[in-house]
Amino acid sequence: MKGINGAKRVRHDASPSAQDGYVTPEKRVKRWSGGQTAANYREWDVEEVCLFLASHGLGELEVIFRENKIKGRILEYLTDSHLKDLQISSVALRLDLLSCLRMLCQNSPSIMKVFNDPIHGHIELHPLLVRIIDTPEFQRLRYIKQLGGSYYVFPGASHNRFEHSIGVGYLAGCLVQALHERQPDLQIDMRDMLCVQIAGLCHDLGHGPFSHMFDGRFMPLACPQKKFKHESASVAMFDHLIQSNGLEEAMKENGLCLPDDLTFIKEQIAGPLSSEAEQQFNSSPNSSSWPYRGRTEEKSFLYEIVANKRNGIDVDKWDYFARDCHHLGIQNNFDYKRFLKFARVCEVGSKKHICTRDKEVGNLYDMFHTRNCLHRRAYQHKVGNIIETMITDAFVKADPHIKIEGANGKYYSISGSVDDMVAYTKLTDNIYHQILYSNDPNLKEAREILQKVERRHLYKYIGQTHPHSNSRIEPDKYDKLPADLASSVPQTSAKDVELHAEDFIVDVIHMDYGMKEQNPINNVRFYCKADPRKAIKIRRDQVSQLLPEKFAEQIIRVYCKKTDEKSLETAKRYFIQWCMNKDFSKPQDGDVVAPDMTPLKASWVDDDDDEDNEGKQQTELLHKSRVKLFTN
């Protein structure tokens, strides 16, 4: 008599051979060993998969698995919806099978590659991610500084986009895995997990030399008509990486479905891919329409892991907070591991969003405050910024004379290389030293600027001011600011010193909490312990009275290219006169630099008195509160 798996059943009698587990050769049954073969379950053929099913009491599924030719490499990607499609109607049977498959995948010896990261410790990455890392396009990130010119101010800031990208890929896996384990009903499958990790790994492939200096300073000057964004370049570089290294087949072997999963990965990096959908999404990110094609609205939360366009809470920030603080020597006050413990998905309207516990709202405000502190103390450091400005000047002057070979033997300039990924792969921070050590007479001006950077002969900082919120300077006016400043000649300036527009650099900086003037917490949803399924909104006044009233400001810094003492003294008076003319805030050293000028503006004189009066009122109020507290 045969069992359900078609094999002869073993006799269950009291004979010594049966009790001892010994079966005569003619009675032996081929069994799944559960030992050595389990380590290589991805290499199983259909029959070996069926033996595994039979050994776990799931032999009735053998026919289905044989008919659909399901091999070992598919097992870890099977989900409940897949089993339904296979006409497995019994819920209990599906759950038993998924439980067995989960144990198989977890208990088999790991095929992951281990990296020892200074921030996250020993981390494991999927072999497909390692295949992506081991390509020239990804290795290029080893030669692009994470913080650009900040390395010239902070000696420890020598880290590169390479290690940051690996960290983001790892954290993306941590978050999606946490959601999968906490909420199996979300039906996050292995395809989803792998795509999210790949998106995290590849999100910065498109960065140019010195990272944000390239897209924030150089490209707007060298090629303003291109509207270059490193996210779009990351998508183009990702396509080039996959095609030039023949990774499509490796992706399919690991269970990905092309081209849908490629679309999903690219959408996580750069947002909606079609221009119409992107424009609609940028104008109204909370719109009810669904702009993505890689995943349905049912899995909308997956788009909030790598680059969260909704509120800015994503694994990219988590890694650069920890990594940048480590290398800068600045304290990091945000603990992403705590966020992982409380993250869960809740429905908000027709979409599903990643939410956190209501008690975590204060920590999220601290997270955005940490971001603001990093910008003030490091990313927008006045010396780091002027060094990047000088490097940008050198690159702009060198741009027409640098030739980088691209596809089909065509050559491109620095700014033109973004149109050809073969050329762009060769463009890294090394271009700095290529210019610095060049003997080309066409690069003389650029070379001299970089030599000044090397000798620390920098453009001199003149001062800083703030425009009022109702008089913000628009980007299309930036080019006119140096000329406007040069025309603000103070009456008491030195007659033998004349300054022109080309002598000034005016740097306009935007500081915010990541979403311009908006409070990003307004776009975060929380849940409470009483009902974890219900998403709620928490207003700022429900948290604390000490939180910021405004979430964005504009800072204007002025530098002078002339470095002699007389020119600098005159430049500072020009600057103060310009601030008076434009009704900007009084420079911090205004009373010291030009004590004869600042009293001429009434609002500047009254500022101190107003602040003193306000301080007295606050002190009196605090005193009354204490009296009331101790007399009750």
From Swiss-Prot:
The keyword Hydrolase applies. Allosterically activated and regulated via the combined actions of GTP and dNTPs (dATP, dGTP, dTTP and dCTP): Allosteric site 1 binds GTP, while allosteric site 2 binds dNTP. Allosteric activation promotes the formation of highly active homotetramers. InterPro entries: dGTPase-like, HD/PDEase_dom, HD_domain, SAM, SAM/pointed_sf. Binds 1 zinc ion per subunit. Residues 44-107 form the SAM domain. SUPFAM superfamilies: HD-domain/PDEase-like (SSF109604), SAM/Pointed domain (SSF47769). DGTP 1 binds at residues 146-147, 161, 317, 320, 324, 371, 379-380. It comes from the Eukaryota. Its cofactor is Zn(2+). One of its GO terms (cellular component) is nucleus. DGTP 2 binds at residues 116, 153, 338, 357, 359, 363, 381-382, 529. It is found in: Nucleus; Chromosome. Keywords: Allosteric enzyme, Antiviral defense, Chromosome, DNA damage, DNA repair, DNA replication, GTP-binding, Hydrolase, Immunity, Innate immunity, Manganese, Metal-binding, Nucleotide-binding, Nucleus, Zinc. One of its GO terms (biological process) is innate immune response. It is an enzyme of class 3 (hydrolase). Belongs to the SAMHD1 family. Homodimer; in absence of GTP and dNTP. Homotetramer; in GTP- and dNTP-bound form. Interacts with rbbp8/CtIP. This is Deoxynucleoside triphosphate triphosphohydrolase SAMHD1. It comes from Xenopus laevis (African clawed frog).
